[in-house]
């Protein structure tokens, strides 16, 4: 019994020891797990902090890169703005150098009054060749630049240009004078070294001279080793044209004797960089309009405000007969393009309608069918008190500036007929004093052919019919601008009154006359066509 108890106690003791060992191992294992978890947490925290620091560092680097890019872009924009200002200044200097004898400038503004240094002249001319103003119109040089590698042009190419040759000739002349002591023109002509200029300067020397003159250029970069030149900023034709149009004004109602000298005198208070004044081929007279490009868009707008609808004294002196002339009209280049496009669309619509009517006429039956005329309200003006004996060409000349296409009905007292003149004017012809270039369709109607025709137009009267009411309002505004807010026009040196509001009965009577006239002409051509058919049939039967 004692032995049994002893064995039992021993087993219990062993079991207790086993449980204690197990619990101890479990505690140790839990402690180890806790240590591992703490280590993992600490490592994760360290990794998170490292990643955060790295992200902050990357973000700072990105911000610095963005700031550097923005600063670089701003610097490039500033440099490009300086580049454009420098180009405009060079263009202005070149214009003044070419036209300094056209106007009297003050000593402060006459930049080129003093003789420029030869190298400075060479630099100015080379810079002008690469300016936007010149490259916009110089397709030859644009082609050379585009075909050259990296837009670098050999300097030797410019030795063939006329302006460069003139400057180089001045250099050679000075060199000969200083070397051989030539003092007058007769000695120059007889001197062998003057006749043979290559004895003084070689082609290589001239190229090096051009290269050296461009070292300080703000517009051009020169490669000293390869003797090539290029712009500091590439040329963009589309942007250059856009900038040029923004600072260009269109001026019309100029007299035939107007010249570039006159325009320089009128706009002498503003900086001009280019004048385009088209001339007639035979007479070399002004076609009546011009394009002037100013130094900046702001100066162009200021010139528009200051000079528009004015009567410059320079033009009054040129105008012997003020027929439709006086104040000039100035509009922006964009407005001129809109007017030009509007006129093209109007002409296109009229041609389409004309072709449509012709096709309908061809398909018509053998019986004549009269047509109706659309009555257009408020598109007439009437001129009265026209001097006796005035010819139709003189009336046309007086009203030619009122619109692009309109009709002029006028009684020719010599033939006792109504002369209905369709006047079609291009933009150039609108201001041309010569009537020979104006397309006129003469439609003659006997006065006794239409009832109430004598009440429509009496002696010394003319009716002007425009395409629509908008063109009529524009014509009235032109008359007011030209005649100090008076509805008048000058014909044969006599002031004639203009009536802008036609009574309703008279207007209705006029449109009845237009309908009658059109049908009379259609009937005339219809009968002529029928007669032609009969002749063909008779000849065929024979």
UniProtKB/Swiss-Prot annotation:
InterPro entries: La_dom_prot, La_HTH, La_xRRM, Nucleotide-bd_a/b_plait_sf, RBD_domain_sf, RRM_dom, WH-like_DNA-bd_sf, WH_DNA-bd_sf. Keywords: Chromosome, RNA-binding, Telomere. Disruption phenotype: Critically short telomeres. Reduced accumulation of telomerase RNA TER. It is found in: Chromosome, Telomere. Pfam families: La, RRM_1. Residues 374-542 form the xRRM domain. One of its GO terms (biological process) is telomerase RNA stabilization. One of its GO terms (molecular function) is telomerase RNA binding. It comes from the Eukaryota. PROSITE patterns: HTH_LA (PS50961), RRM (PS50102), XRRM (PS51939). Residues 112-239 form the HTH La-type RNA-binding domain. GO terms for cellular component: chromosome, telomeric region; telomerase holoenzyme complex. Residues 247-335 form the RRM domain. Belongs to the LARP7 family. RNA-binding protein required for assembly of the holoenzyme telomerase ribonucleoprotein (RNP) complex. Telomerase is an essential ribonucleoprotein enzyme that copies new telomeric repeats onto chromosome ends by repetitively synthesizing the short telomere-repeat sequence 5'-TTGGGG-3' using an RNA template component TER. Component of the telomerase holoenzyme complex, composed of the catalytic core (the catalytic subunit TERT, the telomerase RNA template component TER and TAP65/p65), which is associated with two heterotrimeric subcomplexes: (i) the replication protein A (RPA)-related subcomplex, composed of TEB1, RPA2/TEB2 and RPA3/TEB3 and (ii) the CST-like subcomplex, composed of TAP75/p75, TAP45/p45 and TAP19/p19. TEB1 and the CST-like subcomplex are tethered to the catalytic core by TAP50/p50. The HTH La-type RNA-binding and RRM domains cooperatively bind to TER RNA UUU-3'OH sequence after it is transcribed by Polymerase III. UUU-3'OH-binding by the HTH La-type RNA-binding and RRM domains positions the xRRM domain to bind to the adjacent proximal stem-loop IV and central dinucleotide GA bulge. This is La-related protein 7 homolog. It comes from Tetrahymena thermophila (strain SB210).
